[in-house]
């Protein structure tokens, strides 16, 4: 029996991983269709003219922006909530998500697909951005929030990939390491991993 929700997802990608973690946090049943971006299935081509991933399908609704998908899922399935109740808290987390999307994610894409020289420049820049973010991980058990949020679902897939990208945490990065180890044990994160992503590094004991 097919579920009402279907997610077309790449097997190893931070934006796709983010949506899978949101779905896992919500405990929502869905059909996962892992897609080779270079060879998309006919279903995806018919549903999404951009053939972009991730693509979420719920009955007649088709969504294909990670941010839109994440906010839709949080509103469509309100428990547990993945954003703070207060406007200030929501705005703060949205800004953090935008920074990760605009500043961090493109660097990961350059590291994985660019030339050797481009990858090295991007690797240094991402290392610097991670180092600059250390104080943010001291603020709360989760990322700038008392509970798991969409921001955690955005940043954890990035942190999971750092070692595979050749990026070591800075000397003062223990707050990030502690946060990452907590989050990598979280059931939603564990359930969000594909077989390919599980091979990137070991889960903490």
Regions found by a protein language model. Give the residues of each.
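GST-like domain detector, emphasizing the conserved glutathione-binding G-site
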Residues: 1-130, 134-135, 141
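Short, solvent-exposed turn/loop segments enriched in Gly/Ser/Thr/Pro and often Arg
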Residues: 10, 150, 196
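GST-like fold's C-terminal all-alpha helical module
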Residues: 96, 100-192
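Acidic/histidine-enriched, glycine/proline-rich intrinsically disordered or flexible terminal extensions
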Residues: 196-205
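Conserved beta-strand edge residues that scaffold enzyme active sites
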Residues: 37-38, 176, 197
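Residue-level detector of family-conserved "landmark" positions at structurally sensitive sites
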Residues: 33, 66, 172, 193-194
